[in-house]
A protein has these predicted regions:
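Soluble non-transmembrane domains of integral membrane proteins
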Residues: 1-41
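First transmembrane helix
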Residues: 38-61, 168-181
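Juxtamembrane interface at the cytosolic side of transmembrane helices
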Residues: 56-75
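Conserved hydrophobic/aromatic pocket- or pore-lining residues that grip, position, or stack substrates
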Residues: 66, 78, 122, 266
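Cytoplasmic-side transmembrane-helix entry/capping segments in multi-pass membrane proteins
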Residues: 72-76, 136-139
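Interfacial "cap-and-anchor" motif at the non-cytosolic start of specific transmembrane alpha-helices
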Residues: 82-124, 129-256
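Conserved nucleotide-binding and Mg2+-coordinating catalytic segments in signaling enzymes
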Residues: 256-276, 297
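Active-site-proximal structural segments of metal-dependent nucleotidyl cyclase/transferase enzymes
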Residues: 277-297
């Protein structure tokens, strides 16, 4: 806490860093500081609690259904939580307080991890391998190459190059997510509507935060936390997309089972229905020692 004498005071700060730096300066009294801390704690608690609940829900779905999309989505959300903890400073204070190396590179590594897990989720959820195999291959090999390049920069301690690579990858990742959603929607994937809307929300939130950090638009708590609001909307819409996709799979399975029992043209029961009903009749006859007969004409 700083104390200033009555009247005007001049306070000079010199800050230098290779990373993007947010330095909002405000003079607050003790009550205002306590209120700001309380608002920050509640807002981050709500954000992390909501995302952790979605992670737990999708992990349970993956355990029961073995759908890769649910696992990829959980990894994507977990990566965003770690990234948020890193760039807000919480991870540096709680998880690696004594590691200057991790403090320098954790945000950049997690930015790349977010792009990689997001593209992996998009590839599986949109099933790009079936209707856009070239795009699927490009996303898979391109994301791996970007990860390897960033790891090389970190190991060689090329901080400036790693910084540019991470930010460029996140920007490209956002555009690729929108492009993948649009292409899948063009190919008739109904669930892609939710995916496209979700990625647009995330992109808008990220853009507002970036513009605020760069000084293009006014910097305030709303514009700075726009990325958090965007990810909340994105996570909600993607959860709806996964639920819609699961409902589609259930309807397709029920339809396949119905077609396996009944001929769609004649409406007559087919072999599977005969075996199911005949097996039950046979078991009843054996249990009660009754004779049965079948007419093959």
């Amino acid at each position: 806490m700083c104390r200033f004498p009555p009247g005007d005071s001049a306070l000079y700060l010199r800050v230098a860093t290779a990373d993007a730096l947010i330095l909002p300066m405000r003079l607050l009294d003790s009550q205002q500081v306590a209120l700001a801390q309380q608002i920050s704690q509640y807002s981050y608690g709500a954000l992390y609690g909501f995302l952790l609940a979605l992670i737990a829900y999708n992990l349970m779905l993956y355990a029961g259904l073995r759908e890769t999309s649910n696992l990829c989505y959980s990894l994507y959300l977990a990566t965003f939580i770690l990234l948020n903890l890193s760039y807000t400073g919480h991870a540096g204070a709680w998880l690696w307080p004594d590691s200057l190396y991790l403090k320098r590179y954790s945000t950049l590594l997690l930015m790349m991890a977010l792009a990689w897990t997001g593209l992996r989720f998009a590839r599986h959820f949109l099933d790009l391998a079936s209707h856009a195999p070239r795009l699927d291959q490009a996303l898979r090999h391109g994301s791996r190459l970007a990860v390897l390049l960033l790891i090389l920069c970190v190991l060689a301690d090329w901080h400036a190059l790693a910084n540019h690579l991470a930010f460029a990858s996140v920007l490209l990742y956002t555009l690729l997510m929108v492009a993948a959603g649009w292409l899948s929607l063009h190919h008739g994937r109904v669930a892609a509507r939710y995916f496209l809307a979700a990625t647009l929300c995330g992109m808008l939130g990220t853009a507002l935060t970036d513009l605020a950090v760069w000084g293009v638009i006014p910097f305030n708590p709303l514009t700075y936390r726009a990325v958090d609001l965007g990810i909340l909307l994105e996570a909600s819409l993607l959860a709806l997309a996964l639920a819609y996709q699961m409902r589609q799979h259930q309807q397709a399975r029920r339809q396949a089972e119905s077609l396996a029992r009944q001929d769609p043209l004649t409406g007559l029961l087919n072999r599977r229905a005969f075996l199911e009903q005949g097996q039950q009749l046979w078991q009843d006859s054996q249990r009660h020692a009754r004779n049965i007969s079948a007419n093959g004409d």
